[in-house]
Amino acid sequence: MRFDAAFVRKFLTFGCIGGGVYVFDASCFWLFIQLTGWPSLARVISVALAMTLSWWLNRTFTFRVNGPVNWGEMIKFMLSQLPGACINALFSLLAFHYLPFAKDNTWIATAVGSCAGLVANFTMAHLFVFNKNRNA
């Protein structure tokens, strides 16, 4: 990976999209809890919608892929984000348990996890999903 201006633009775009998708995910989670009364079902629905939106936005704006929708690419994207999700969860829990101010401000623990997961998620998407050289 080269850290040139194009790479930095992609990384920053990926991060901004992630922030927007987080708001979308949290909103959907709240909405589907209200509609179904089942938090577990609401979470599954909100995560599925958020991951789909994340794939489409990153495909379109971060990696600038043109052409028809590629469902295999979407599945590959979702699978590629699993390591980042695990890193996110781990760092969120570590922050929650070991940063005294994070226990009362869970958004801090969530932010720590999100930042740690961002690096893994971007790397996986950049190298394994939207890498033109690898996918040629």
State each model region's role.
Residues 1-136:
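Alpha-helical membrane-protein topology signature
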